[in-house]
Amino acid sequence: MKNIVFAAVLFTAAFILTASRPVKVVFNELYRPQYHFSPERNYMGNPSGLVFIDGEYHMFYQHNPKGNEEGFSHLGHAYSTDLIHWEHMPVAIFPDNLSEDKDFCTALPGSAFVDHNNVLGFQKGPQKSLVVFYTSSGCGQRMAYSHDKGQTWNKYPGNPVIPYDSTDHAANPKVLWHEPTSKWVMLLYRMPGNDERKQGFSFYTSDNLVDWEYQSHLAGFFKSPDLTELRVNNRPDDTRWVLTEGEGEYILGSFDGKKFTPESIRMKSDWGKNYSASQNWSNIPASDGRTIQLAGMTGGEWTGMPFQGQMTFPCELSLKKINTGIFLIRQPVKEIEQLYQKEYSWKNENLIPGLGHNLIKKIGGDCLRIKGRFDLKNCESFGLMLRTGKKTQGTELVYNVKRETLSLLGQTVPLSPVDNKIHLDILLDRSSVEVFANNGRAAISCNIFNQENDKGYILFNTGGELLVEELEIYEMKSIWEAAE
């Protein structure tokens, strides 16, 4: 009898111990992105600070460690040495005032940078301080700093640096250094007087990162501001400042350290329904010279998954003159090439509609990069069916020649051919598709959720001939060690 009781106790103890452990994350679930960043578990929203330091790309992101729904927002943390493979870190920033409320004093997206000159005076030893500015919901704009590259964090004792104002909905502080004026600049989303007509970005300046002076306000923008100076056609004597907002729009202009002066109409960088709140990495070395952007992909439903949300693939930004205009160009960073596995390629294939011939019939998989240059010849439309199956038609990406539009999942992009040709660069992962058209001139980022065995692809054209000048398809490696 004693042995039976003892065995029962051991079984109960083992059951309790097992039940108390978090479920192991295998990174190979049905909808787990294999080469886009996603959290180990629970909800992830938008980027909340991107900074490079000592060979590491650090990413902070909106995160609910309690579940898969939005709320109880903390700032999660991960880093990478190559923008591809990511190491998950402990939660960086917790809600303020010991708040356990779903919304009050929770940590919402902001920005991150390096305090090179120890302006705050918090540096210990040779390691430069990392600084994060963030919105504490209902509790103002706040600051935290780290002595050890983000492993541990201290909140500034004088928080909030900008007090909460119930009449302006202030959020998403973007802090950057403006070299010509030797000032710190903060862009802050605001809705002065709770008037939607006035919502936009306010500009503040500071010498010490603590005391901020209001300078100007630019109406007509919604959340998640960012500002960077880029060369036009890579010419150092011809630059524009690029102001971006949370819904994928941007505007070009000049910036004197206090006021942004628009010099273009508002334009759209990404037309996808899940693209959200882009940010640029700060502190990228001059020897690299790139401006690298990341955005959230939110609004999808990762049903049955231990996580919710993913990021876009990191992109390099540039400005290019096209005809009489200047446009923002987004292209996947070159580091993506290290993920290439098996390659398929075709050149100068003439496709005639109605023959039932699918050039890419043998292609299968759920993680691909598809790059192609297509001469429209006399076709009326062409495109691809992505992730087809025995019982499903897949997701249609189609270019309409007459209308000069590219469409995906109900999102339609105006896109003119160049020399009667369309270029497509498609990043396909288990729960997303990103399309970069005409060498990054336009993009569409959307979440898709297919059945496990839906791994077929169809290249089609209608109304006339299509010349596939060049087509390359790469099977992609997983970035997650646990998924191999």
Residue ranges and their predicted role:
Residues 1-2, 239, 437:
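Generic cytosolic/nucleocytoplasmic N-terminal low-complexity/intrinsically disordered segments
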Residues 20-173, 177-225, 229-273, 288, ...:
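Beta-rich carbohydrate-recognition and catalytic domains
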Residues 256-273, 282-484:
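Beta-rich accessory regions
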Residues 279:
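Structured, non-membrane catalytic/scaffold regions adjacent to prosthetic-group chemistry
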